[in-house]
Amino acid sequence: MTESESAAVPVDAAAYREAMSRLASAVHLITTDGPGGRAGFTASAVCSVSDAPPTLLVCINRTSSAYAALTQNGTLCVNTLGEGHETVAGLFGGRTPVDERFAAGTWRRLRSGALALTDALVSFDCRIVGRHAVGSHDVLYCAVEAVAASGQADALLYSERRYRTLPRAPRSGAAPAEPARAARALGARPAEGPALALRSA
């Protein structure tokens, strides 16, 4: 046993949350609608698992108000947000009633029955094909059945408990972004909802 192994101690939960706040993540609205009810929450714990077949991973706290509807419906939509979506991200990330959350955006119903935000950067229509409990959360494995990319805004990120924006990369041959536009990505705006990396409303 090495000296570092013998000195190892459990990581404090608060220290872990603080460390995770340093990770910049895309911001998503996870929505569902169906026999289990309509629900949605803001999340950053989303990532790709595979492209063969296309599969996403979504994490949700089992105490989330959206948990029952999401697991009963068995379907969801991952809506990736852009600049200008800070308000709706805050509504879905707090304790706002469901009707007020969905009143903040314009939606269209997908094949699965889930609702897609019409101006999201991209929306993934998904069916939940697997679920695994880890600590306080469930890890959902979601088969992607359709993709719609419509939004043209800069990407919305969440880092150090603040929203930030990341300018879109210029097209090949296009002029570089204006300095002021690039600098804006380094600015921070206070988040309207709770920390997203570890908690879901």
Swiss-Prot record:
Root EC class: oxidoreductase
Statement: the UniProt record of this protein carries the keyword NAD: yes
Keywords: Flavoprotein, FMN, NAD, Oxidoreductase
Function statement: Catalyzes the reduction of FMN to FMNH2 which is used to reduce pyrimidine by RutA via the Rut pathway.
PANTHER family cross-referenced by the UniProt entry: FLAVIN REDUCTASE, FMN REDUCTASE (NADH) RUTF
Family the UniProt entry places it in: Belongs to the non-flavoprotein flavin reductase family. RutF subfamily.
Protein name as catalogued: FMN reductase (NADH) RutF
Record organism: Methylorubrum extorquens (strain ATCC 14718 / DSM 1338 / JCM 2805 / NCIMB 9133 / AM1)
